[in-house]
């Protein structure tokens, strides 16, 4: 698959149900790792791993390229807070970028930020990535990821 691509996304918080989070990563060899931890109603952590075809990896790269996220900077984005944090790390070609911000509830939060254009790019990219991962996990394991 080539070692020029890696993606990791994390969103989570620590609250009355402990450390609840969603995390996934795509490794250069095509391995998709997925973890979803919720202690709500004594749920257990869901961990799944699968290998995806190189065409999926190419589509992932296309989604990232089309989003133009590599042109963004998180300096003016809301910092992580008690509501939670999001992290996105991407290695694509010679570029290595990493973003950290608070959880985003809706586009209202995006529009009220100091960098609505940049945060909007992040927001929609994350929505696309989560949709893709949930579909892959759901289809591969026949489970509901949430």
From Swiss-Prot:
It holds the Pfam family Mago_nashi. This is Protein mago nashi homolog 2. Belongs to the mago nashi family. GO terms for molecular function: RNA binding. Required for pre-mRNA splicing as component of the spliceosome. Plays a redundant role with MAGOH in the exon junction complex and in the nonsense-mediated decay (NMD) pathway. It is found in: Nucleus. Ubiquitous. Detected in brain, heart, liver, lung, spleen and testis. Gene3D superfamilies: Mago nashi. The gene is Magohb. Induction: In macrophages, strongly induced by bacterial lipopolysaccharide (LPS). Levels reach a maximum 6 hours after exposure to LPS and are lower, but still much increased after 12 and 24 hours. Its main location: nucleus. Component of the pre-catalytic, catalytic and post-catalytic spliceosome complexes. Heterodimer with RBM8A. Core component of the mRNA splicing-dependent exon junction complex (EJC); the core complex contains CASC3, EIF4A3, MAGOH or MAGOHB, and RBM8A. InterPro entries: Mago_nashi (IPR004023), Mago_nashi_sf (IPR036605). Keywords: mRNA processing, mRNA splicing, mRNA transport, Nucleus, RNA-binding, Spliceosome, Transport. The keyword RNA-binding applies. GO terms for cellular component: cytosol; exon-exon junction complex; exon-exon junction subcomplex mago-y14; nucleus; U2-type catalytic step 1 spliceosome; U2-type precatalytic spliceosome. One of its GO terms (biological process) is mRNA export from nucleus.
């Amino acid at each position: 698959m080539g070692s020029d691509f890696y993606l990791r996304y994390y969103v989570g918080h620590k609250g009355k149900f402990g450390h609840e989070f969603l995390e996934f990563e795509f490794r250069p060899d095509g391995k998709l790792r997925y973890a979803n931890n919720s202690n709500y109603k004594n749920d257990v952590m869901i961990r799944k791993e699968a290998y995806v075809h190189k065409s999926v990896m190419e589509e992932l790269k296309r989604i990232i390229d089309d989003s133009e996220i590599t042109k963004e900077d998180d300096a003016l984005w809301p910092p992580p807070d008690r509501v939670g944090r999001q992290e996105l790390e991407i290695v694509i070609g010679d570029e290595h970028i990493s973003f950290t911000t608070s959880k985003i509830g809706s586009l209202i939060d995006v529009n009220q930020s100091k960098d609505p254009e940049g945060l909007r790019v992040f927001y929609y990219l994350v929505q696309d990535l989560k949709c893709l991962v949930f579909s892959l996990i759901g289809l591969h394991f026949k489970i509901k990821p949430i």
